[in-house]
């Protein structure tokens, strides 16, 4: 059965689809896929900030220190902390008169 053979006609109750064989497995599969696509699209629009923020920033956690000796872990932590610490020497004090 071709989908082009379906006819939509206006009735008293609204638009209805008069299909000769609506139990066709292809039609059922297409309906299920369409409904799932709609649900996923709605969820994506509702939670896109959360999802994409997690993908963008959640995966950038740095290298794993699992399996490394404790001394190397401590050295790595100190390097990371020193990269974050602010050095007061680089600031310029401006005094307004």
Swiss-Prot record:
One of its GO terms (cellular component) is host cell plasma membrane. Residues 60-83 are annotated as: Disordered. The chain crosses the membrane at residues 23-43. It comes from the Viruses. The record marks 41 as: Seems to be involved in pH gating. The M2 protein from most influenza A strains is inhibited by amantadine and rimantadine, resulting in viral uncoating incapacity. Emergence of amantadine-resistant variants is usually rapid. Residues 1-22 are virion surface. It holds the Pfam family Flu_M2. It is found in: Virion membrane; Host apical cell membrane. Residues 44-97 are intravirion. A lipid is attached at residue 50 (S-palmitoyl cysteine). One of its GO terms (molecular function) is monoatomic ion channel activity. It is a single-pass type III membrane protein. Keywords: Disulfide bond, Host cell membrane, Host membrane, Host-virus interaction, Hydrogen ion transport, Inhibition of host autophagy by virus, Ion channel, Ion transport, Lipoprotein, Membrane, Palmitate, Phosphoprotein, Signal-anchor, Transmembrane, Transmembrane helix, Transport, Viral ion channel, Virion. The modification Phosphoserine is found at residues 64, 82. The record marks 37 as: Essential for channel activity, possibly by being protonated during channel activation, and by forming the channel gate and the selective filter. One of its GO terms (biological process) is symbiont genome entry into host cell via pore formation in plasma membrane. Forms a proton-selective ion channel that is necessary for the efficient release of the viral genome during virus entry. After attaching to the cell surface, the virion enters the cell by endocytosis. Acidification of the endosome triggers M2 ion channel activity. Belongs to the influenza viruses matrix protein M2 family. Homotetramer; composed of two disulfide-linked dimers held together by non-covalent interactions. May interact with matrix protein 1. When the channel is activated, one or more imidazole moieties of His-37 probably become bi-protonated. Cytoplasmic tail plays an important role in virion assembly and morphogenesis. This is Matrix protein 2. The gene is M.
